[in-house]
């Protein structure tokens, strides 16, 4: 037995010191795997335990849902992806990309919505014997983002250019979908058509099964966590500036019929900014575009201690990064507003995150925060 082993096995001071040293080294090695090291997460955990619990449950639920679908899958073709990154999808696109990279799932190609008539937009065939399209390890993954359009998976599965015998080999999967219009009559008809396909994935079961039921602010609601939740605790800790000449940024997608008096009365007190990102380079991919939009948004919101926005993806970013803001959710689309309110309920926090239906109300909320 060598000297180190004799010391370790002994009951003397040297043996105990060696054991303590090895135990401490093991804790240091395992710490990144056991604990999130992000400072934002630590702050949330200590200052807002309920809020932190909801965020953690959101991310855990997303991974549970996706891992259950994509276990063993090595390659995917993304369908129904947006053709360009935009204000209503940039953070979701980043979340989808992060999850797939984290799970080492290779994206063979992506097909944007709406489906064009180009030959390269059709799904791959499996008769070439390629391991890439081995039905055991390959899936067609619906990557629809929260943009409001009808679910068109059947365009790919049931399109006349794809023989039904080939379609039967597809493993059809989907990122979470959170809006009621995906359960419309057209979707149900499409799902009925693909029901004979082995290993089918029915979107209509998402709300009842894969999404689970989570308790949000005392109410049990069904919801699908946005793919951007995979970024939770992974983004760099971003701090808002404490004080500027104009304390509040109003970051809008439209003018909300603001009266002229608004500009006259508040133009010195608030900064009004409409969505106007820089142009994308010609060679940029959609993932490059999403990152450019992310950088653009961050460059705006960090300049001010508070902001108001009607852009849902910016609101999500504010929630994840603990940024003080009010989300402007007008009641112009009752159904969508209802579902957004349902799952955002838990993320409203006193003096940090709030939701308002009118811009003037949102500004009054922040003015109250500033007095505290």
UniProtKB/Swiss-Prot annotation:
Domain of life: Eukaryota
TM region positions: 13-35
Cytoplasmic-side segments: 1-12
Keywords assigned by UniProt, alphabetized: Cell wall biogenesis/degradation, Glycoprotein, Golgi apparatus, Meiosis, Membrane, Signal-anchor, Transmembrane, Transmembrane helix
GO biological process assignments: 4,6-pyruvylated galactose residue biosynthetic process; cell wall organization; fungal-type cell wall biogenesis; meiotic cell cycle
Membrane topology classification: Single-pass type II membrane protein
Lumenal side: 36-372
Primary location class: Golgi
Subcellular location: Golgi apparatus membrane
Residues glycosylated per entry: 38, 128
Claim: Cell wall biogenesis/degradation is one of the keywords in the record: yes
Hydrolase found in the keyword field: no
GO CC annotations on file: Golgi membrane
Function text: Involved in cell wall biogenesis. Has a role in the addition of Gal-beta1,3 moeities to galactomannans and their subsequent pyruvylation. Has a role in meiosis.
Protein name: Pyruvylated Gal-beta-1,3-epitope synthesis protein 5
């Amino acid at each position: 037995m060598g000297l180190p082993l004799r010391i370790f096995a002994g009951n003397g001071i040297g043996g105990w010191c060696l054991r303590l040293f090895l135990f401490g080294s093991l804790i240091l090695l395992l710490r990144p795997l056991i604990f999130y090291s992000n400072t934002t997460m630590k702050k949330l955990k200590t200052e807002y335990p309920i809020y932190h619990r909801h965020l953690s449950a959101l991310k855990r639920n997303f991974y549970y849902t996706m891992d259950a679908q994509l276990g063993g899958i090595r390659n995917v073709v993304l369908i129904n992806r947006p053709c360009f990154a935009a204000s209503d999808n940039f953070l979701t696109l980043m979340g989808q990309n992060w999850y797939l990279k984290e799970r080492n799932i290779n994206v063979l190609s992506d097909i944007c919505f709406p489906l064009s008539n180009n030959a390269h937009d059709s799904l791959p065939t499996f008769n070439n014997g390629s391991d890439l399209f081995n039905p055991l390890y390959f899936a067609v993954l619906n990557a629809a983002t929260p943009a409001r359009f009808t679910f068109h998976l059947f365009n790919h599965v049931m399109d006349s250019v794809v023989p039904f015998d080939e379609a039967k080999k597809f493993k059809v999967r989907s990122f979470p979908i959170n809006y009621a219009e995906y359960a419309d009559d057209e979707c149900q008809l499409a799902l009925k058509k693909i029901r004979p396909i082995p290993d089918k994935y029915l979107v209509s079961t998402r709300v009842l099964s894969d999404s689970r039921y989570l308790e949000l602010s005392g109410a049990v609601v069904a919801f699908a966590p946005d793919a951007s939740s995979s970024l939770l605790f992974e983004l760099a800790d971003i701090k808002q500036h404490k004080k500027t000449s104009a304390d509040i940024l109003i970051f809008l997608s439209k003018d909300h019929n603001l009266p002229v008096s608004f500009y006259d009365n508040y133009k010195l007190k608030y900064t009004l900014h409409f969505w106007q990102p820089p142009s994308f380079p010609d060679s940029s991919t959609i993932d490059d575009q999403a990152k450019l939009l992310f950088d653009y948004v961050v460059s705006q919101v960090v300049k001010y201690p508070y902001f108001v926005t009607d852009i849902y993806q910016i609101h999500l970013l504010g929630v994840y990064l603990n940024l003080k803001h009010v989300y402007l959710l007008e009641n112009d689309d009752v159904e969508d507003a209802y579902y957004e309110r349902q799952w955002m309920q838990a993320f409203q926090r006193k003096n940090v995150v709030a939701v308002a239906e009118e811009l003037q109300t949102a500004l009054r909320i922040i003015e109250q925060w500033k007095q505290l």
